[in-house]
From Swiss-Prot:
Biological process annotations from GO: translation
PROSITE patterns associated with the record: RIBOSOMAL_L16_1, RIBOSOMAL_L16_2
Entries under InterPro entries matching the protein: Ribosomal_uL16, Ribosomal_uL16_bact-type, Ribosomal_uL16_CS, Ribosomal_uL16_dom, Ribosomal_uL16_sf
Residue segments, region Disordered: 1-22
PANTHER family, alphabetized: 50S/60S RIBOSOMAL PROTEIN L16 (PTHR12220), LARGE RIBOSOMAL SUBUNIT PROTEIN UL16M (PTHR12220:SF13)
Organism: Nitratiruptor sp. (strain SB155-2)
Keywords: Ribonucleoprotein, Ribosomal protein, RNA-binding, rRNA-binding, tRNA-binding
Protein name: Large ribosomal subunit protein uL16
GO cellular component term of the entry, any: cytosolic large ribosomal subunit
A matching Pfam family: Ribosomal_L16
Length: 141
């Protein structure tokens, strides 16, 4: 699973996920990719599940880039625990996603196969996404 090797603080505040993505909103490495259309958060298991689905579809040909990294700890208190007694322990690592953010990129695969693989990955993600190419990238989301 993806997670930081070391952090300055073990736990973080929740924060707010507002606005649109100004960084990481265009294809940088591949020729086709997945772009988020709405706010959400993605955890390391979802990132890995989508990556495995894509890799199996393209039979390990081409190259896949993961453009997101879960660096925010999500905490949870144990079940049937009374309130108080401090913040819960870290349960998983997530990343807040804003509309316009590129999640995955792919190159070295023919476009029809790449679209099928990216569609499989889109089903694994918890927010609306669309497939973008270098030509269609300039469209408004």
């Amino acid at each position: 699973m993806l997670m930081p090797k070391k952090t300055k603080y073990r736990k973080q505040q929740k924060g707010r996920n507002r606005g649109k993505a100004y960084n990481g909103n265009s294809l940088a490495f591949g020729t086709i990719g997945i772009k988020a259309l709405e706010h959400g958060r993605i955890d390391s298991r979802q990132i890995e599940a989508a990556r495995v689905a894509m890799t199996r579809k393209v039979k390990r040909t081409g190259k896949i880039w993961i453009r997101v990294f879960p660096d925010k700890p999500l905490t949870k208190k144990p079940l049937e625990t009374r309130m108080g007694k401090g913040k819960g322990s870290v349960e998983k690592w997530v990343m807040n996603i804003k509309p316009g953010r590129i999640i995955y990129e792919m190159a070295g695969v023919e476009e029809s196969l790449a679209r099928e693989a990216l569609d499989l990955a889109r089903y694994k993600l918890p927010f609306k996404t669309k497939i973008v190419t270098q030509e269609s990238e300039n469209e408004i989301y």
